[in-house]
Structures are given as structure tokens and as C-alpha cells.
Amino acid sequence: HEPEAQKGLNALTALMMGRGGTASMSYEELTERLNPWSASISAQFDKEMTVLVGEVHRDHLDPFVTILRDLIVTPGFDEADFARNREFLTNSVVSTLRGTDDEELGKETLNALLYAEHPYGVPVNGTEDGLAAIELDDVRAFHAAHYTKGNVIVGVAGGYPDGFVERVELEIVSLLPNGDASPMALPTVSTLDGREVLLVDKDAIATAISIGFPIDVTRADDDFYALMVANSYFGEHRTFNGLLMNKMRGQRGLNYGDYSYIENFIQDGGSRLPVTNIPRRQQLFSIWIRPVPHHNAHFALRQAIRELEVLVNEGLTETEFDASREFLLNYSKLYVQTTSRRLGYHMDSAVYGTAYFIDEIQRRLPSLTVTDVNDAIRRHLQSENLAIAIVTSDAEAFR
């Protein structure tokens, strides 16, 4: 819903609540109030969902809810908060993404190539020009238009008292304005024609590579669970269960790691686990080749594509299937080690219209067969039409 010329408006609006004050309390006063309670309020934003996350000990629940209510319903929209948060987002794009984080730049380059003329094609933090074009009144208007009753999902977990959920509905949700709750229609993702490459030339010490293509599968589809097994075998994030990791790092020592994904993936802090609450109606299959020395970049790209070709053409053996399914049945239990993560997956399941995702993994995977997995691979994965994003020095020579 962001205007084309104001990319970053959603992120900036979210930060005015997650890193801002209320109409009656400055951000500094709010922080001083929360710190003695060991409480926190933060904002997480993606293309289709923004989440305001609050955590507090139950002894301080009553005053905490009042602060949370005021942040959501009547944000302060303070000029100093606006300037600080816009500068934070601008620095994240200019200094971090473009300046020092070649891995993320490679992923965003893949998005730009894969999702041209599409809302997913721009970084969630916005663009330098888009952020510069945003005024405080634009943030106020965006908040009024989209933070409405029909757009809200409330999730509560932990040791809360009886009637607390109803209280949140009454004291927070009911105070929001009415509004259009229908999601924006998404354009069809452009069809790839062969292997399309986008090179970014910068003074990088190594070459970062991301590969991907759109898939018509989300957690709402039965085939998602079969693809979970296939993906765990092929490229489970930051584990040696994945074939890519074993062959490219383990056997050849090309780089730190090589992984694959069947949906948009953001790592949760320093863990190996995915962030919750970033559901999308359109998903992609992707391969992340972490930076490799320039002289090995061509080889790493060719090997990753070759391994994908083998996966598509040959699938998994019975032994590979059994081992990967068993690994995933156990590993997925680690997804919900905290109350916050359990709540996050419950909310994601509500968005996708499914039963609780973690329970579904335990229910569905035991009944899968190797034929189910290989059939799903043939239906949804391929190696001929690929978007390939490369961040490297002397890009012209890479051609």
C-alpha cells in the first residue's frame, strides 16, 4: 500500500510505534518506564504484515497495556522521533545494505530481478529516495488508513489473567477506526526466460550469489510439507543436513555456507531459526551461496545449479528421504523454544488459514512417502528458468 514514490512509509510508520512515544509520553519517558519492568515493545515489518510485539512480567501488565494501547491508537508522531527513525532506515539502506552487507545486497538484488514492477521487489526498509520523500503527515495518514479494526490480529501468550484477551480487544482494538480490510491485489510475478543474471559491481572482497524463482506454494498448500522435506535434504539453513552445505563447504571448502529455502526466509537474530510473522501470499524457491573468493565464484555458481538439476531430475532416494524426514520431525520442535515464537507460529497459521503449523509438521510428515516428495519436486522445482543475482568486484569480467 506504499505510494511508489514513498518506499519505506510502512517501515517508518511501524517504527513510530516501536521506537517512538505516545501522545502523552515521549519516547525517552516511555523507555524509562519500561526498563525497570524488564519490558520491551518493538516493531517488526515485512511486505504483508507489521507486528508490534510487547513483552512484560505479569506484575506490570496493567500499566503496560495502557502504554501499548496509546502507542497503537494514539502514537505521538513526534518530529524528533520521525527524524531519528527516518535516519535509522536511511542508514540501513545506504550505509549497511549498499555499503557493508554484500550478502543482504545479493538477496535484495535477487528480489529486484525476480519481482520487477512488484511490491516485493523493494527492500522492506525502503529506498533512499523514497524515505527522503516522506513527511510526517504522510506517516499520520498511512497510520489512519491501515491501522484499523479489520486489519488487526491479536495474539497473547504466557501467564496472563482470565479475561485479558477480551480486555485487549475492548481497550485497544475497539478504539481503532473502521477501514478497508481487504488486502491489496498482487500482480503476477514476471515469467523468467532462461537464466537471467543481474550483476552488481562494487568493491567487494568476495562474491555473493543468490538464485531463485517463484513457486505457487505456501503453507496453506499440501505440497508445502513435501517440499519441506526436499528442501531440508537439499539446503537446510545453517546445518550440515543439507546437501549444498556438505558438498560446497564440507567437501570443497568454497565458503562458510550454502542453503536453500521454499519461502521468504529471515534469520531470527543469531539463531539458525526463521523469523515468524513474515507470511506472504506469493513465495519463491531460493538458494543462498554465501560469499566465495572471486576466483571460485564461477565454479560455485555452476555447482549450485548442477546440484539443483540433480535434485529436480533424480529426486531423493528412500534412504535420503527417511533421514531428512526424521531430521525435520525433530528439528522443527526447536522452532518453538520460546513463548514468543510459539505465539508467532500460531498467528502465522491464522493468516494462512491452517491448523497450527508445528502440529501440522508432526501430523503430516509421518504419512509422506518418498514418491510424494519427488512428485512435489517435479511439480514445483526446476533449474532452467532462474533469476541469478551476483554482487562482485569487476562485474564486467565476471560475464
Can you describe what each PLM-predicted range is?
Residues 222-230, 244:
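PPIase-associated folding chaperone regions across multiple families
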Residues 1-18, 22-73, 92, 102-129, ...:
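M16 family metallopeptidases and their MPP-like homologs
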Residues 368-375:
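A short, acidic, amphipathic alpha-helical segment used as a generic capping/interface helix at domain edges
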Residues 140-145, 194-201, 274-277, 376-379:
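Short, surface-exposed beta-strand/loop micro-motifs that present aromatic residues
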Residues 56-57, 89-96, 187-201, 326-335:
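Short, conserved secondary-structure transition motifs
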Residues 91, 95, 107-108, 136-171, ...:
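Non-catalytic, conformational "gating/processing" segments within enzyme and secreted inhibitor domains
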Residues 62-63, 162-166, 221, 294-299, ...:
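Short, conserved charged micro-motifs
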Residues 116, 153-217, 236, 392-399:
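An aromatic/glycine/proline-enriched structural segment found at the starts
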